[in-house]
Amino acid sequence: MNTYPKLFSPIKIGETTVKNRVFMPPISTNLADKGYVTDALVEHYAARAKGGVGLIVTEVTTVEPTYVYLPGDMSICDDSYIPGWEKLTAAVHKYGAKILPQLFHRNLRRFPVYHLSMHSHYEPVGILGILLPLPH
């Protein structure tokens, strides 16, 4: 008897059909190089797709170059990142899985800031210049 009869059945999300209901949540690997997809990242996500995951949500993916949560984060802040993402997407699609980025942006909390091109530390920032107190 199958305890979870729908687990391996397709599911439609909007216009997209996912081959099963096995979803991989975002898990940081810090394998990107200054925001760019690396071969190690492609291998990592392709292995999960090959193993049967239906939908993969990538790790933190920054949307602006002046704010990175960790130096090994992925990015899509400009078109120079597209070739790596195309390679990653093709590798995951090869095994019938879908993939989407976990979009990451700064918020009202202060965090250390790393610039993608230098990985140097900047002062804490917040959206619109509004900063909430740091938690204790």
Question: Where are the model-predicted features located?
Answer:
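Flavin-dependent oxidoreductase catalytic cores
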Residues: 1-136
